[in-house]
């Protein structure tokens, strides 16, 4: 069971809501994934019409919403988006995203740390999206973040665990849950992330852009489960040379 702040999750696969062809496909994919935590960008919500076509069906599914500050260019904008989410959605949970570069969407470490400090002081449950930087992740822990969400590779790139060496360090040192976010493009990559010891993964593009999003969601669900079980079972140690599975005995000389 995964616990973040005061909430427990049976599923270690978190999902997003962007890039789906329509809301019905999105809902069916979320159901198939068995995800219990779903991110939604504040910039996509039309509060003028109350509970819009995005929020209403998500609440009917029964998942916990994790509003994000995607689109924020600095700490001030991110804090504003988080406070809007708390007021309009009634949640203290926030996925903190600050990426001023519209091309590569790389997170701004300095602004993210500052926003995290402010939001934690205001009582938010903060899950920051950041570079796979062990030092930064430790600093975010220290200011009170409930989890850290280091990237595997650029958002939506499907490149997989490009930052694996750094993710290993973060997982080793973390005292809060580590959710690997961004760039996971295949179920095998999600399984690998879980084998490393990640507490969860967040997948959106790889599911939403698939020719069969519902089937792909099921595949990711199973991959995450298998990866976690493999981690808990204990993977064999990697050797530099060959190791005999059946050591030679003297029977050949008899």
Swiss-Prot record:
EC number: 2.8.1.10
Involved pathway(s): Cofactor biosynthesis; thiamine diphosphate biosynthesis
GO molecular function: thiazole synthase activity
Transferase is among the record's keywords: yes
GO-annotated cellular components: cytoplasm
Cytoplasm listed as a keyword: yes
GO biological process, one term: thiamine diphosphate biosynthetic process
Active-site annotation: 95
Top enzyme class: transferase
Amino-acid positions noted as binding 1-deoxy-D-xylulose 5-phosphate in the UniProt annotation, renumbered to this chain: 156, 182-183, 204-205
Pfam families: ThiG
Main location group: cytoplasm
Subcellular localization(s) per the UniProt record: Cytoplasm
Keywords, ordered alphabetically: Cytoplasm, Schiff base, Thiamine biosynthesis, Transferase
Catalysed reaction equations from the record: [ThiS sulfur-carrier protein]-C-terminal-Gly-aminoethanethioate + 2-iminoacetate + 1-deoxy-D-xylulose 5-phosphate = [ThiS sulfur-carrier protein]-C-terminal Gly-Gly + 2-[(2R,5Z)-2-carboxy-4-methylthiazol-5(2H)-ylidene]ethyl phosphate + 2 H2O + H(+)
InterPro entries for the chain: Aldolase_TIM (IPR013785), Thiazole_synthase_ThiG (IPR033983), ThiG (IPR008867)
Subunit structure as annotated in this protein's UniProt entry: Homotetramer. Forms heterodimers with either ThiH or ThiS.
Assigned protein family: Belongs to the ThiG family.
Known function: Catalyzes the rearrangement of 1-deoxy-D-xylulose 5-phosphate (DXP) to produce the thiazole phosphate moiety of thiamine. Sulfur is provided by the thiocarboxylate moiety of the carrier protein ThiS. In vitro, sulfur can be provided by H(2)S.
This protein's name: Thiazole synthase
Organism whose genome encodes this protein: Shewanella sp. (strain W3-18-1)
């Amino acid at each position: 069971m995964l616990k973040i702040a005061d909430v427990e999750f049976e599923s270690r696969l978190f999902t997003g809501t962007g890039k789906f062809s329509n809301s019905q496909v999105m809902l069916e994919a979320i159901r198939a994934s068995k995800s219990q935590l779903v991110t939604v960008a504040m910039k996509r919500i039309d509060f003028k019409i109350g509970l819009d076509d995005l929020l209403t069906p998500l609440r009917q599914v029964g998942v916990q919403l994790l509003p994000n500050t995607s689109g924020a260019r600095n700490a001030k904008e991110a804090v504003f988006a988080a406070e809007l989410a708390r007021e309009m959605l009634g949640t203290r949970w926030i996925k903190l995203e600050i990426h001023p570069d519209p091309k590569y969407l790389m997170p701004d470490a300095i602004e993210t740390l500052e926003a995290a400090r402010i939001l934690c002081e205001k009582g938010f449950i903060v899950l920051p999206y950041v570079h796979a930087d062990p030092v930064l992740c430790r600093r975010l822990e220290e200011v009170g973040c409930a989890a850290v969400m280091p990237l595997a590779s650029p958002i939506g790139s499907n490149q997989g665990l490009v930052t694996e060496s750094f993710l290993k360090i973060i997982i080793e040192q973390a005292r809060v849950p580590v959710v690997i976010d961004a760039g996971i493009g295949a179920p095998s990559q999600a399984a690998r992330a879980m084998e490393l010891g990640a507490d969860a993964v967040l997948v959106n593009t790889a599911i939403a852009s698939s020719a069969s999003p519902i089937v792909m969601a099921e595949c990711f669900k199973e991959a995450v489960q298998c990866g976690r079980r493999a981690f808990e079972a204990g993977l064999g140690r990697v050797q530099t040379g060959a190791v005999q599975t059946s050591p030679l005995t003297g029977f050949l000389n008899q």
